[in-house]
Amino acid sequence: MINFNELIKVGNFNKSHGIKGEISFVFTNNFFFKGKNSFLICEMEGIFIPFRVESYRSISNSTVLVKLKNINTIEQTKLLTYQEVFLPKKQSAENTKLNYFSWDHYIGFNIIDEKNREIGSITDIDKSTINTLFIVEKESKEILIPTANEMIVTIDEKRKIIYMKLPVGLL
C-alpha cells in the first residue's frame, strides 16, 4: 500500500483531451517532465493508485497531454479530472541527483543577462499560468521572466546564478 508520507505532489490532472483517453497534466515542478517516470499516482477514494504512463507530449512549459494505460475513454478520464498527482519521494530524489530540480529550487538565485548585467534576484515562482514565471525583484520592482528553457543559457549552482538570453523589450 502506498503511504502519503512517501509521496511528493508534482501537479494536477486538468481536463480530458480528445476521445481516446488523453488528459492534460499541469505539473508544478519539473520532476515529471525531466525525469524518467513510468507511472503517476492519484488518490482515489482514500487510496493512492499508480497509473502507468503510456505516452505523453508537451504542449507548454508546464503542461503535457498524458495517455495512461487502460484509460481509453472520456468517461474514464473524467474520473481523474482535477485530481492531484504525486510521485514517490524516492523517485523525486533520484531526479534531483540528476539535476532535475523543481523551479522552486531557484528561489534566491540571481539572473544575469547576455550582456552580463544583473537583472535581479528570484523571489518567487508563478505557476498560475500556462508558462511558469520567475518573479524577480530589481530595485523594489517585480519583473516576471518566463522559465523557458530556450532562454536559459547556463545555471551556476555554486554561485546561485542563472544566465539568460532575454527577449528585447522584456525589461
Swiss-Prot record:
Its main location: cytoplasm. One of its GO terms (cellular component) is cytoplasm. GO terms for molecular function: ribosome binding. One of its GO terms (biological process) is ribosomal small subunit biogenesis. Keywords: Chaperone, Cytoplasm, Ribosome biogenesis, rRNA processing. It is found in: Cytoplasm. Signal peptide: none annotated. It comes from the Bacteria. Pfam families: PRC_RimM, RimM. Residues 97-170 form the PRC barrel domain. The keyword Cell membrane does not apply. Binds ribosomal protein uS19. Belongs to the RimM family. The PRC barrel domain binds ribosomal protein uS19. An accessory protein needed during the final step in the assembly of 30S ribosomal subunit, possibly for assembly of the head region. Essential for efficient processing of 16S rRNA. May be needed both before and after RbfA during the maturation of 16S rRNA. It has affinity for free ribosomal 30S subunits but not for 70S ribosomes. This is Ribosome maturation factor RimM. The gene is rimM.
